[in-house]
Structure formats: C-alpha cells, structure tokens
Amino acid sequence: MIALIQRVSEASVTVDGQVTGTIGKGLLVLLGVEKEDDESKTKRLRDKVLGYRIFEDDAGKMNLNVQQAGGSVLVVSQFTLAADTKSGMRPSFSVGAAPADAERLYDYFVECCKDKDIQTETGIFAADMKVALLNDGPVTFWLQV
C-alpha cells in the first residue's frame, strides 16, 4: 500500500462540479492499493501517515504530526501509484489491487483515520476527480508498507 502525502495549506476534490471533500491545513493523501495489501497493512500505513512528523514546531523544525499541528486529512484514491514503470514507455498496473479489493481497503483506510479522531475528507473512489491544493513547502513524501 502506497501513500503519497503532501503537506498543504488547503486542498479540495471536486467530482462532476461538486466539491466532495475540502480541508484547510493538513495532509493530502493520494492512496494506491496493491494486490498483496490487507487490513493489517492498511492500519500500519494509517499509523505512519498520521504519525509522520512533517509539520513545524515552534523552533521551525519538522517535529509535529498532522494531529499535533491541528490539521485535517483529505484522502484521494489513486491507482496509478501502483504502476510498474521499470520498463517500456507505458505503465503496467499488474501489481495494483483488483478494483473491488482496492475500494474496500480505501474505505477501510478512511475509516481507520476517522477512528483516530481526525477530520477526514475524501474524494470518490474511481471517479474522475479534480484535485486542487496549495502546497505548504512544498513537502511531499512517498510512504509504502
């Protein structure tokens, strides 16, 4: 399971002209699900995403996680993160989870975030989405479990 996380000042996702999720300060989480992923990996990635200390403390050091910084999370499904790009000029998605499995684990990731009492907004799984964000930094990390 892969999360590309970006520290943002604000972010939103729109589907068919309707905003489905919006946050202020926090993390935009682009989530990719692979074939071998399960609930255990989902919880481990949730813990890593929410615990990752990429927000500045009073001394200006990256020392706070999203909850300590008073932020929110916007989770957007992105199957292209599970692409194999090692050869050729066209990505292969053979390592990506089947759509039904990916949706189930995406939903589980969202619920796991909400269980930690953090404001969690979402896009719509497998929809054509427009994602708007204002990067803070920019600060972007690739997390994989």
Curated annotation (Swiss-Prot):
GO terms for biological process: D-amino acid catabolic process. It is found in: Cytoplasm. Its main location: cytoplasm. Keywords: Cytoplasm, Hydrolase, RNA-binding, tRNA-binding. One of its GO terms (cellular component) is cytoplasm. The keyword RNA-binding applies. GO terms for molecular function: D-tyrosyl-tRNA(Tyr) deacylase activity; Gly-tRNA(Ala) deacylase activity; Ser(Gly)-tRNA(Ala) hydrolase activity; tRNA binding. Gene3D superfamilies: D-tyrosyl-tRNA(Tyr) deacylase. Its EC number is 3.1.1.96. A motif (Gly-cisPro motif, important for rejection of L-amino acids) lies at residues 137-138. Coiled coil: none annotated. It catalyses: glycyl-tRNA(Ala) + H2O = tRNA(Ala) + glycine + H(+); a D-aminoacyl-tRNA + H2O = a tRNA + a D-alpha-amino acid + H(+). It comes from the Bacteria. An aminoacyl-tRNA editing enzyme that deacylates mischarged D-aminoacyl-tRNAs. Also deacylates mischarged glycyl-tRNA(Ala), protecting cells against glycine mischarging by AlaRS. Acts via tRNA-based rather than protein-based catalysis; rejects L-amino acids rather than detecting D-amino acids in the active site. By recycling D-aminoacyl-tRNA to D-amino acids and free tRNA molecules, this enzyme counteracts the toxicity associated with the formation of D-aminoacyl-tRNA entities in vivo and helps enforce protein L-homochirality. A Gly-cisPro motif from one monomer fits into the active site of the other monomer to allow specific chiral rejection of L-amino acids. Homodimer. HAMAP family: Deacylase_Dtd (MF_00518). Belongs to the DTD family. This is D-aminoacyl-tRNA deacylase. The lineage of its organism: Bacteria, Pseudomonadati, Pseudomonadota, Gammaproteobacteria, Vibrionales.
